[in-house]
């Protein structure tokens, strides 16, 4: 999947991400493309990309050093779904390599008291 601005509609991108989710053989080579989707204006695409990056980071943590800070930036989102997905993604990456998320470790605990239940559950 090669993402280029305005090349795909939201539904096409979501469908592509769904197909990519099932094709783990190409995950490692697709990390950069999925990361690029974090810059879209679509909440749905950003959320799916964050989720998939978490899964990819669990499998390929060695490829995630340059992406973790951008994922962590979503922890400050006003959108609960993006906070939830970022928290989940960091948790997945951290399970594979704690050192990657160590700079954010203390900040993660504030989400135990988040106003949104889904965010609190992702903290666990």
Give the role of each language-model region:
Residues 10-17, 32, 47-50, 83-88, ...:
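Alpha-solenoid HEAT/ARM repeat scaffold
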Residues 78-102:
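Helix-adjacent hinge/juxtasegments
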Residues 27-35, 42-51:
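A positional/architectural concept
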Residues 18, 54-55, 91-92:
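Structural signature of alpha-helical solenoid repeat scaffolds
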Residues 1-36:
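N-terminal "cap/leader" segments of large eukaryotic alpha-helical scaffolds
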Residues 25-37, 61-74, 98-111:
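Amphipathic alpha-helical scaffolding segments comprising HEAT/armadillo-like alpha-solenoid repeats
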Residues 41, 59, 78, 96, ...:
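Structural signature of alpha-solenoid helical repeat scaffolds
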Residues 7-11, 28, 43-44, 80-81, ...:
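Alpha-helix N-cap/helix-start positions at coil->helix boundaries
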């Amino acid at each position: 999947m090669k993402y280029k601005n305005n090349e795909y509609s939201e539904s096409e991108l979501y469908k592509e991400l769904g197909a990519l989710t099932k094709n783990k053989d190409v995950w490692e080579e697709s990390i950069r493309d999925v990361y690029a989707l974090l810059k879209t204006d679509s909440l749905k695409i950003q959320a799916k990309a964050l989720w998939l990056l978490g899964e990819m980071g669990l499998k390929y943590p060695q490829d995630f050093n340059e992406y973790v800070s951008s994922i962590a930036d979503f922890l400050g989102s006003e959108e609960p779904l993006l906070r939830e997905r970022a928290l989940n993604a960091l948790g997945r990456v951290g399970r594979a390599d704690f050192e990657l998320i160590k700079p954010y470790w203390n900040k993660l605990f504030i989400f135990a008291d988040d106003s949104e239940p889904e965010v609190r559950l992702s903290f666990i």
